[in-house]
Swiss-Prot record:
Protein location: Cytoplasm
Modified residues (Phosphothreonine): T14, T159
Record gene name: CRK2
Residues the record lists as binding ATP: I10, G11, E12, G13, T14, Y15, G16, V17, V18, K32
Its job: Serine/threonine-protein kinase. Involved in the control of the cell cycle. Required for entry into S-phase and mitosis. Probable component of the kinase complex that phosphorylates the repetitive C-terminus of RNA polymerase II.
Active site location: D126 (proton acceptor)
Protein name: Cyclin-dependent kinase 2 homolog
Record bears the keyword GTP-binding: no
Enzyme Commission numbers on file: 2.7.11.22, 2.7.11.23
Phosphotyrosine PTM positions: Y15
GO biological process annotation, one example: cell division
Quaternary state and interactors: May form a complex composed of at least the catalytic subunit CRK2 and a cyclin.
Keyword Chloroplast listed: no
Length: 289
């Protein structure tokens, strides 16, 4: 820690306190101080250490770079590149949603970063606008990649704030333990819709409410649109039956190709969701440099 000074607290995230600091050359970094779950004799979880070492190997222009891991007494300190703004703040100040060209650029960058990590068998598991950082050049970078795998998604955040359910896939909400790449794609779809609409698509207040909000818009799953849904632990055959709404009734300012892409991301059945690599090749991006 001696090489960093001028610590300024800039936030409290899912896993700990985040500080802005400088090194001796005046370069800015984001330091995440993470409390570790202890194993025997107070030794940090070997799983945590192993997972974080994998993150250090990830190198992509759309992923926040992890420069260093400092092993302190009861915590790990992760040293990341520092960016000033996150996507949530940007959406909040842009009343009515982002401009279409901006939303398209951010979505493509997000998919590029996601595709890279999925190719390297790393999942995010906790994608949301707060985890997407943006610099002054309009570059989007994904933060906290892999931390959910390393430390688990806690029921409550470090700040005692309930972890948001708004971007969580219906298969996970119904108890699926098969964490794979489609859970990140669902989150990307929710973020895409939020960039376009200027507000969250499924702002649930509990797991049950979250599912009902999804079903009221996309329809209740059945044997036709999701053959394996009955196998999920929290599936209830007595779920209220809703028919899917027309996309144009709840998505504003998106053309037909954009709606087609979004609909492929927000498939109820995870096996039917588009992959990040496939999404990058979608016609929606054909006019994007």
């Amino acid at each position: 820690m001696e090489k960093y000074h001028g610590l300024e607290k800039i936030g409290e995230g899912t896993y700990g306190v985040v500080y802005k600091a400088q090194n001796s050359d005046g370069e800015s970094f984001a330091l995440k101080k993470i409390r570790l779950e202890k194993e025997d004799e107070g030794i940090p979880s070997t799983v945590s250490i192993r997972e974080i070492s994998i993150l250090k190997e990830l190198r992509h222009s759309n992923i926040v770079k992890l420069y260093d891991v400092i092993h302190a007494k009861k915590r790990l300190i992760l040293v990341f590149e520092h960016l000033d703004q996150d996507l949530k703040k940007l959406i909040d100040v842009c009343d009515g949603g982002l401009e279409s060209v901006t939303a398209k650029s951010f979505l493509l960058q997000l998919l590029n970063g996601i595709a890279y990590c999925h190719e390297h068998r790393v999942l995010h598991r906790d994608l949301k606008p707060q985890n997407l950082l943006i610099n002054r050049e309009g570059e989007l970078k994904i933060a906290d990649f892999g931390l959910a795998r390393a430390f688990g998604i806690p029921a409550r955040r470090y700040t005692h704030e309930v972890v948001t359910l708004w971007y969580r896939a219906p298969d996970i909400l119904m108890g699926s333990k098969k964490y794979s790449t489609p859970i990140d794609i669902w989150s990307v779809g929710c973020i895409f819709a939020e960039m376009v609409n200027g507000r969250p698509l499924f702002p649930g207040v509990s797991e049950t409410d979250q599912l009902m909000r999804i079903f009221k818009i996309l329809g209740t799953p059945n044997s036709q649109n999701w053959p394996d849904v009955f196998k999920l632990p929290k599936y209830d055959p007595n779920f209220p039956v809703y028919e899917p709404l027309p996309w144009e009734t709840f998505i504003k300012g998106l053309d037909d190709t954009g709606i087609d892409l979004l609909s492929k991301m927000l498939k109820l059945d995870p096996n039917q969701r588009i992959t990040a690599k496939q999404a990058i090749e979608h016609p929606y991006f054909k006019e994007t440099n």
